[in-house]
Amino acid sequence: MPTTQKTLMFLSGFLTSLGSVVVICSILATQAWITSRIFFTDAISNGTIVITYGLFRGTSAQELNEGLQDLDKNFEVLGILDNSSQKSLHLVVILLLILSLAASVLSSVFTFYNSISNPYQTFLGPMGVYTWNGLSASFVFLAMVLFVGNAESNHLSDKLSQKLYPDTTNKRTTHTYGYSFWLTLHVIFLNIVTAVIIIFYQKARYRQKQEQRKPVEYAPRDGILF
């Protein structure tokens, strides 16, 4: 059976891993990843299109300086994108977050298993915990970078705007990233905290082993028998 110290520390790691699972699920479910303001003109009006969307769903509205305003629209991100580079990169972002979710789930399983067992010298021990947390953080970071690249350089918001309002001409676009996007940093933070907890446990375990292996010369001697 594991010691009380090990149980408590790995349960702490389990809670932080479980926290990252919950955060990733929130990231996938919410649609406040980005809000884009697209300044446009068409034959009879001009103004701003405001698009807010996440990985799967979004909303759009017009703020006109003059002309007849369209009704607000709800849309499916993947549903209105054709087979384009924007859609391909968006799918990669979703895939990376799903992989990060799977890695965080495995980290939760490994930390909980270590809190009730002693698979220390195998991959099921701390090495497995480090691996899954490292992969989870890496996948999330790549998803962040690709999403920003798709929005800024690959003009994802402009593509969505053209599909929603085909008769408009886009002039300029600005982006504001929402809480769903910034939650990805919390996932990386929780992955780091989980790894740090296990590092502290390993250091404490190493110190205990060193104390148990004190040289014989420090032990009391009553005498030497010949």
UniProtKB/Swiss-Prot annotation:
Residues passing through the membrane, by range: 8-28, 92-112, 128-148, 181-201
Residues carrying covalently attached carbohydrate according to the record: 46
One Gene Ontology term from the biological process aspect of the record: sensory perception of sound
InterPro entries named among the record's database cross-references: Clarin
Location in the cell: Membrane
Highest taxon above the source species: Eukaryota
A GO-annotated cellular component: membrane
Keywords: Glycoprotein, Membrane, Transmembrane, Transmembrane helix
Topology with respect to the bilayer: Multi-pass membrane protein
Protein family: Belongs to the clarin family.
Protein name per the record: Clarin-3
Species, as recorded: Mus musculus
